[in-house]
Swiss-Prot record:
SUPFAM superfamilies named in the record: P-loop containing nucleoside triphosphate hydrolases, Sec63 N-terminal domain-like, Winged helix' DNA-binding domain
InterPro entries noted in UniProt: DEAD/DEAH_box_helicase_dom, Hel308-like_dom4, Hel308_SKI2-like, Helicase_ATP-bd, Helicase_C-like, Helicase_Hel308, HTH_61, P-loop_NTPase
Record GO terms (molecular function): 3'-5' DNA helicase activity; ATP binding; ATP hydrolysis activity; DNA binding
Official protein name in the record: ATP-dependent DNA helicase Hel308
Matches recorded under CDD domains: DEXHc_archSki2, SF2_C_Ski2
Organism whose genome encodes this protein: Methanococcus vannielii (strain ATCC 35089 / DSM 1224 / JCM 13029 / OCM 148 / SB)
Top EC class for this record: isomerase
Similarity comment: Belongs to the helicase family. Hel308 subfamily.
Length: 751
C-alpha cells in the first residue's frame, strides 16, 4: 500500500478524495478481493483503477512484479485518452503501457507491457488467438461496468467477466450508475463500495418558462428557484446564455442526431464572446473544413455552427471531427455542444450545465422514455473540478406533464441492469469462441460456464437460456463449425442438441440419464470454426457468406467485373455485422427489384432489398463517386459512411479468408475479394492503388494526380513541382516530406 500512495504523491496527488480513501480502507489493495465501486462521475473512479493497477505491477521497492493489469473501457476514443494519460504518468517508473484497439484478426505481441488498455470486444478477440501473456494477468479494471446491460455489447462484457472469474484475476468494476449494484457485486463475489461524494456540488433542476426549479438532493420536497433572463424568443437560448455569461459551458443532450444538429443551428453566441474567443472559434471552424479532402455539407454545417460558439457531436461525424470538437470544448473555446447521449459514455467532457432537451425518444416500438440510468450518466457530466463552483443537471420541460416526468427521472430509483446473454447472436459468437479455443470441450463444461454467468446468477433457472444454447449448438454442428463426439450413442440420439435441466440445474438428456453419466460427450472445433472464431464474426454471417459465394460461383461466368463486385457487396451486406441496413423507400423498391433481377437474385424479402441497396452504395464508393454525392443519395452522415465502409472492409477480408478455407476454387472470386479489400478501404478504382499507399494521399488527391500523369511513387519523385502546383505549398510539401524530398531538391535523400 505504501508504495502506491508514495508513487501517487510523487506524481502530484498529495491527498486522496473521500471515496478513494474509503475504497483503500475497504481493502482495494488486497489482491484477493474483487470490488464493485459505484461513485459519482468526477469523484475519482479512474484513479481507483490506477491504484489497483500499480499495486499489481509494482512491488514495495517500485520494481516490476512481472504481473499484468488490464484497463477495459467501452470506447476506442476513451482507450486512446487513457493510454496517453497513463503513459505520461507512469513510464518514468519503468511501467510499460500498451493499447490494443485495432482489427480483431490480429495477435499483437503485448507481452512486454505491464498495463494494457483495451475494449471488451478486442480483449475477447485477443483471447481467441491463445495469447501467452494471459497467464501473467492478475487484475482487470472494468470502466463503465454497467454496460453489461447494453443490448449490443453487454453479452461480450458478461462473457469476458465470466472468463476473468474463471482465471482468478482480481476484478475491479467501476460505474456511476447501477440500479442493482448488490446483485452484480454478489455475482462477481465482490465487495460493494458506494459513496455519494462529489468534488463539485451537482444541482439538479427542471427548466420551464424561464425558471429553473431546483430539487434538493437531501429532501426532494424542498425546492428553490432561479429566474433566467429572457433575451430571445428561444428559452433554451436564454438558458445557454445565462451559463455562458457566468463563464460556464453547456452540453445539450438531444434524442437523435438530427435534433442535435438542428438544435445547434438555433443558437448564436457571437455577441456574448470576446474578439479573442471569436478568433479561436474561426480557427477551429477552418480546421473542420480541412479534415476531409472535400468538405461535406455536414462539415460545412459544423464549421458554421462553431463560428457562433456552438457545435454538434454525434456518431455521424468522423473521428477527426469529433476530436476537434472535443478539444475545442475542453479548451473552453466552444461553449456549447449539442449531442446525443453517446457522448456521456465515458468521454472526459465535463461542463457547467448539462441540459437534457428530450426525456423521450423514438424506438422500434414508438416513443419511449429515456432510461433514468442514461439521464443520470448525462447530468453527471456537470461540474468541472477546479473550474466550476458547482454543476447543474437540468431537464427541459415543455409543459406541466413534462415536469412530473422530469421530477421522477431526477429523483426516482435507477433501472436494474439485466443480462443480455440469452440473445442468440451473442450465444453463437461466444459458444463458438469457447469451443474453438478449447476452453469448453464437453457438455458439462459448457453448462458449468453458463452456470457461472450473470444470466444464471440473475435468473437462477437456466431453462430459458438452455433452449437457445441448444439451438446454437445445433446450428454450429449442422454448418460444420464444430463436431460433437459421443461414443455411447448414435449421432442422432440423445445429442447435446436436446439439452434440458432438472430442478437442481443438472443436465438431463432424457428423463433417466443425467450429465454425470455422459462425460464422453464432447465438442471439437473444425478448421472453419477456428478461423471464424479468430475473425470475430457471427457464425451465421459466415454461413451467409459461404452460401452466397457458392451461388456467385454458379453465375460468375455471365458477369462483368462490376457485377461481380456488386454481388460480393450484396453478400456481405446480408451479414449480421452490417446491420442496420439502409432503409428502402416505397418508391425505390420496384427499381431495386428490377436491378436485382439482372444479377439473378430472386429473393425479394425486405432484408435482401435493403442489402442490395447497401451494395449499390459500396459500389459507388469504390468507383470514386464523390463522397458528398453518396451522402446525399443514400441519406447518411460522413461518420456513418466511414463506419459502414470499415465494416464492409472487414467483412470483405473475412470473406476472402473463408473462401480460402472452404476451397471455393474460383480465381475470379478470390482475385475480386483481394482487390476489393484495398479498394473499399480507400474508395477508389484499381488504377489508384499504388498512389493510395502513400501517406496524405486519399482517393480525391490520387485521382487528381492520376489525371495529370502521376501514377506511381517514382512519378512523384520525378515531378515534385507538379505536386506543389497541383495541391499548393501546404499539402504538396506534406506529400513530398513522406519521401524526405524538400521542394526544390531534384533527388530524394535516403531513398
Amino acid at each position: 500500500m505504501t508504495n502506491v500512495l508514495n508513487l501517487l504523491n510523487e506524481i502530484g496527488i498529495e491527498e486522496l478524495r473521500p471515496p478513494q480513501k474509503k475504497v483503500i480502507e475497504e481493502g482495494l489493495l488486497d489482491k484477493s478481493k474483487n470490488f464493485l465501486i459505484c461513485i459519482p462521475t468526477a469523484s475519482g473512479k479512474t484513479l481507483i483503477g490506477e491504484m489497483a493497477l500499480l499495486n499489481h505491477v509494482l512491488d514495495e521497492n517500485y520494481n516490476l512484479t512481472g504481473k499484468k493489469g488490464l484497463f477495459i473501457v467501452p470506447l476506442k476514443a476513451l482507450a486512446s485518452e487513457k493510454f496517453d494519460e497513463f503513459q505520461k504518468k507512469y513510464e518514468t517508473y519503468g511501467i510499460k503501457v500498451g493499447m490494443s484497439i485495432g482489427d480483431y484478426d490480429t495477435k499483437e505481441d503485448l507481452s512486454k507491457y505491464n498495463i494494457i488498455i483495451t475494449t471488451s470486444e478486442k480483449l475477447d478477440s485477443l483471447m481467441r488467438h491463445n495469447i501467452e501473456w494471459i497467464k501473467d494477468l492478475s487484475l482487470a479494471v472494468i470502466d463503465e461496468i454497467h454496460l453489461i446491460g447494453d443490448n449490443e455489447r453487454g453479452g461480450t462484457l458478461e462473457v469476458i467477466l465470466t472468463k476473468l472469474k474463471n482465471i482468478n484475476a482480481q476484478i475491479v468494476g467501476l460505474s456511476a450508475t447501477v440500479g442493482n449494484p448488490e446483485e452484480i457485486a454478489n455475482w462477481l463475489n465482490a465487495k460493494l463500495v458506494t459513496d455519494e461524494w462529489r468534488p463539485v456540488e451537482l444541482k439538479k433542476g427542471i427548466y420551464l418558462e424561464n425558471e429553473i426549479n431546483y430539487i434538493n438532493n437531501q429532501d426532494s420536497q424542498k425546492k428553490s428557484f432561479k429566474a433566467v433572463k429572457s433575451i430571445s424568443r428561444n428559452n433554451l437560448t436564454d438558458l445557454i446564455v445565462d451559463s455562458v455569461n457566468e463563464k460556464g459551458s453547456c452540453l445539450i443532450f438531444c434524442n437523435s442526431k438530427r435534433n442535435a444538429v438542428g438544435e445547434s443551428k438555433k443558437h448564436n453566441l457571437t455577441k456574448y464572446l470576446s474578439k479573442a474567443e471569436l478568433n479561436d472559434l474561426n480557427s477551429i471552424s477552418e480546421e473542420i473544413l480541412s479534415i476531409l479532402e472535400t468538405p461535406t455539407e455536414t462539415c460545412k454545417s459544423l464549421s458554421e455552427c462553431i463560428k457562433k460558439g456552438v457545435a454538434f457531436h454525434h456518431a455521424g461525424l468522423t473521428y477527426q471531427h469529433r476530436k476537434a470538437v472535443e478539444e475545442g470544448f475542453r479548451n473552453k473555446v466552444i461553449k456549447v455542444i449539442c449531442c446525443t447521449p453517446t457522448l456521456s459514455a465515458g468521454l472526459n467532457l465535463p461542463c457547467r450545465r448539462a441540459i437534457i432537451r428530450d426525456i423521450r425518444r423514438y424506438s422500434q416500438n414508438g416513443l419511449i422514455d429515456i432510461p433514468k440510468l442514461e439521464i443520470h450518466q448525462c447530468i453527471g457530466r456537470a461540474g468541472r473540478p477546479g473550474l466550476d463552483p458547482y454543476g447543474e443537471g437540468i431537464i427541459l420541460a415543455k409543459n406541466e406533464k413534462d415536469v412530473e416526468k422530469a421530477f421522477l427521472a431526477l429523483t426516482g430509483p435507477l433501472e436494474n441492469i439485466y443480462s443480455k446473454l440469452s440473445n442468440q447472436k451473442v450465444l453463437r459468437v461466444h459458444i463458438l469462441g469457447l469451443i474453438a479455443t478449447l476452453e469448453i470441450k464437453s457438455t458439462s463444461e459448457l453448462i458449468n460456464f453458463i452456470k457461472n454467468t450473470f444470466y444464471a446468477h440473475q435468473y437462477g433457472n437456466l431453462h430459458g437460456v438452455l433452449t437457445n444454447v441448444s439451438k446454437v449448438v445445433e446450428f454450429l454442428e449442422k454448418n460444420k463449425f464444430i463436431e460433437t463426439l459421443d461414443d455411447d450413442f448414435t449421432p442422432k440420439k440423445n445429442r447435446v442438441l436436446e439439452l434440458t435441466l432438472d430442478n437442481s440445474n443438472n443436465l438431463v438428456l432424457d428423463s433417466k440419464r443425467r450429465m454425470d453419466t455422459l462425460t464422453n460427450l464432447s465438442f471439437k472445433p473444425t478448421n472453419l470454426g477456428k478461423r471464424v472464431s479468430e475473425l470475430y464474426i457471427d457464425p451465421l454471417s459466415s454461413e451467409i457468406i459461404i452460401e452466397g459465394l457458392n451461388e456467385l460461383k454458379e453465375k460468375i461466368n455471365d458477369m462483368d467485373r462490376s457485377n461481380i463486385d456488386q454481388y460480393i457487396f450484396y453478400i456481405i451486406s446480408k451479414a449480421t455485422e452490417m446491420r442496420p441496413l439502409l432503409r428502402v423507400k416505397m418508391d425505390e423498391e420496384l427499381e431495386l427489384i428490377q436491378e436485382m433481377d439482372k444479377l439473378k437474385i430472386s429473393d425479394y424479402s425486405i432484408e435482401n432489398i435493403e442489402a442490395f441497396k447497401n451494395s449499390k452504395m459500396f459500389l459507388d464508393w469504390i468507383n470514386e463517386t464523390p463522397e458528398e454525392v453518396i451522402l446525399e443519395k443514400y441519406g447518411i452522415e460522413p461518420g456513418i459512411l466511414r463506419y459502414k465502409v470499415d465494416q464492409a472492409r472487414w467483412m470483405t477480408y473475412s470473406s476472402k479468408e473463408i473462401a480460402k478455407l472452404v476451397k471455393l476454387n474460383n480465381d475470379k472470386i478470390y482475385k475480386a475479394l483481394l482487390e476489393m479489400e484495398f479498394r473499399i478501404e480507400y474508395g477508389a478504382k484499381e488504377e489508384l492503388i499504388e498512389l493510395l499507399k502513400i501517406k496524405n494521399i486519399g482517393r480525391v488527391r490520387a485521382r487528381r494526380l492520376f489525371n495529370i500523369g502521376i501514377k506511381s511513387k517514382m512519378d512523384i519523385l520525378k515531378n515534385p513541382e507538379k505536386i506543389i502546383s497541383t495541391f499548393g505549398d501546404k499539402v504538396g510539401k506534406k506529400i513530398l516530406d513522406e519521401f524526405g524530398l524538400k521542394y526544390g531538391q531534384q533527388k530524394l535523400s535516403g531513398f
